[in-house]
Amino acid sequence: MTICQFFLQGRCRFGDRCWNEHPRGGGGRPHSAGPVRGAGGGWGAASQRYANVIQPPIFKHSTWGGSGDGGGFSGASDFGSPGNKSAVFSQNRFSALSSAHPADGFSDEEQRLLDCVAKDMATWESSGQWMFSCYSPEAGKPNVSGFREFSAEEVRLEYYNCSANNNTENYINSVNQLVQERRNRLQELKALNASGKESLLSQLKNAVTQPLPSLGFGGQQASSFGFPSFPVSSSSGAASFSFKANPSVPPGNAAAVGSSAAASNPPTFGVTSSPSVPNPVGSGNSSAPSAASFSFKTSGTTSGCGTSGLSGFGSSAAANSSSTAPLPVSATPSAATGTSQSGASSASAAQTAGASGHNVTSAPSAVPNGIASDKLYTPRSELTAEELEQFEAKRFTLGKIPLKPPPIDLLYL
C-alpha cells in the first residue's frame, strides 16, 4: 500500500480512515534500521525503507535566536544572536529622512520653498511672460525683492511722453536697464548660495505686507510709474490719475477726457457746441488737460437737466455751427445761428420742450453761416444760370447742387 506522505509530514487529516498506509512501529513490519535522529529526535524509529525521507527540522524556543548548541539557525554563524542584533539592524535606509538636523541646515518646509522659487524662475525665463511684474512664491507670502512692476499700458504711456519730448533714446536706455536688472535677479534666484538662501528666507518670513491701495470710486490711487523708481523722466501726468475730482477745477466745469480747454464750459442739454480737436496722450502740452481732470463725480451744483459736470447728453459738435449758448423754446432761429428749422419741426420741438422744461436747439443745416434760410423760394433774378439749370433738370449733378431754395414756379406740391 502506498505510504501516506501527509502522515510522514504529520498533517494527515483523515487519521485511521486514510486510504494510504500510516507506518507504525512493532512486529510484522520490515526490519528496522534504528532511529533516524536518535532517542530524542523526530518522530521515533523508522524503517530503513523510509530512511531517505527528509524530516522537517524541529525549532525550539531555546535554540531560536542562537544559544551556541549548533541547532536551528544558530551555531557557528551566530545569526540573530543577542550580541549581534545591534550590528545587523543598525543600518536604517530611512535614517537620513528622519534626521532632525539636515545636512544643509534648512528644514523640509524651507527647502521646499527654495526649490519652488528656483523652479518658478526657470519657468518664468523660458515661458516668455511679462517681465515687469512682481513675484511671490505662495499666496500670503510677501513679494520677492528685486523685481519692478509696471503694466504694459504704463510702459506705453511713458513712451508717448518721451516721444512727444523727442527723448526716445532715454526711454530705450531705461527699458534696457530694467530688463538687465530683472535678468540678473532672475539668474541669482535660480542658483542661490548659502547666504542668498538665508537672506531670501528671512525676507519671506520677516517682511511686512503693505496694505493694498483703494480702488473704489472717490479713493486715491497713485501709480508708481513715473516716480524715481522708474528710470525715465518723472514728468508723466499719469502719476496724478485719480477717480477723484480735481479741486482746482470749479464744479460743473470738468472737461471730458481728450477735450481741449475750450470745452471746459459745459454745454446744456442738447446744445450744439464748437468742435475741438483732442490732444494726443502724453503730448506734453501744458494747456492740455491732465488725467487728474478725469472724474466720475457729478457736479456740485444741482440744477436742471443738462448742467452736470460732464458734457451734456445728446450734445453734438457741428462743424458749421458757431453757437455756444442755448436757445430758449420760444425763440425763433435767426440767420446768425447758421441753422435752419422747418415749421413742423419747430412746433414739435417747442411742444416737447414745453412739456419737459429743457432747452432745445434747432436742427443743423447744410446752409453755410451768413446765408438766410427763412425763405421758401428764391426769385429767378437772384439765381445764376448754373443754378437755374440744376433746378430745371430732372436730377441734380453731384457737386453742383444749389444751396438756395428753388424759384416759386419750380415748386410742385
Curated annotation (Swiss-Prot):
Gene field: NUP42
A GO molecular-function descriptor: zinc ion binding
GO CC annotation terms, alphabetical: nuclear membrane; nuclear pore
FG repeat feature ranges: 14-15, 79-80, 217-218, 225-226, 269-270, 313-314
Any one biological process term the GO annotation gives: protein transport
SMART domains: ZnF_C3H1
Primary localisation category: nucleus
Subunit description: Probable component of the nuclear pore complex (NPC).
Ranges where the record places region Disordered: 252-293, 321-369
Subcellular localization, as worded in the UniProt entry: Nucleus, Nuclear pore complex; Nucleus membrane
Its biological purpose: Required for the export of mRNAs containing poly(A) tails from the nucleus into the cytoplasm.
Membrane topology category: Peripheral membrane protein
Protein name: Nucleoporin NUP42
Keywords: Membrane, Metal-binding, mRNA transport, Nuclear pore complex, Nucleus, Protein transport, Repeat, Translocation, Transport, Zinc, Zinc-finger
C3H1-type zinc finger locations on the chain: 1-25
Domain notes: The FG repeats are interaction sites for karyopherins (importins, exportins) and form probably an affinity gradient, guiding the transport proteins unidirectionally with their cargo through the NPC.
Comp. bias (Low complexity): 321-357
